[in-house]
């Protein structure tokens, strides 16, 4: 059973898994998938094109699936895929891909501390830790365990 605050905005087209908690003032657009057992804290924005696996915790003021900060972006439908059991702390921004043929990808069991920014078309593997305020430019690959 889900626990979705009536003060959260969840587009009726969004696909929400089982046992998901969404706190007040979260904003979730229609082309979004949230897997089972996720927790979405207050003031999180999850934008179109974002896919969250299961067991993720997304903390306050985070923006997932923001448009890429790239002059080459022309408004194509692009994606951000996030795996399972990630901890995404406060004020994190993760951008979607620049082109429809690419994607931004975050693997499993990563820990993104406060203020991290992961730019467009980046591929983060599994078990990575990003310290406070880390900024990753677009088109990067971060291997497991970094």
Regions found by a protein language model. Give the residues of each.
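Structural signal for interior beta-strand "rungs" in well-ordered beta-sheet cores
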Residues: 3-146
């Amino acid at each position: 059973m889900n626990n979705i605050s009536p003060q959260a905005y969840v587009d009726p087209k969004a696909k929400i898994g089982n046992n998901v908690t969404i706190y007040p003032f979260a904003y979730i657009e229609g082309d979004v998938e949230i897997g089972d057992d996720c927790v979405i804290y207050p003031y999180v924005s999850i934008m179109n094109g974002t896919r969250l696996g299961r067991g993720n915790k997304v903390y306050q003021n985070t923006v997932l699936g923001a448009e890429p900060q790239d002059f080459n972006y022309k408004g194509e439908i692009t994606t951000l895929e996030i795996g399972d059991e990630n901890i995404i702390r406060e004020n994190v921004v993760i951008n979607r891909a620049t082109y429809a043929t690419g994607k931004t990808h975050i693997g499993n069991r990563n820990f993104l501390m406060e203020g991290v920014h992961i730019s467009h078309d980046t591929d983060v593997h599994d078990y990575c830790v990003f310290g406070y305020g880390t900024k990753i430019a677009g088109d990067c690959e971060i291997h497991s365990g970094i």
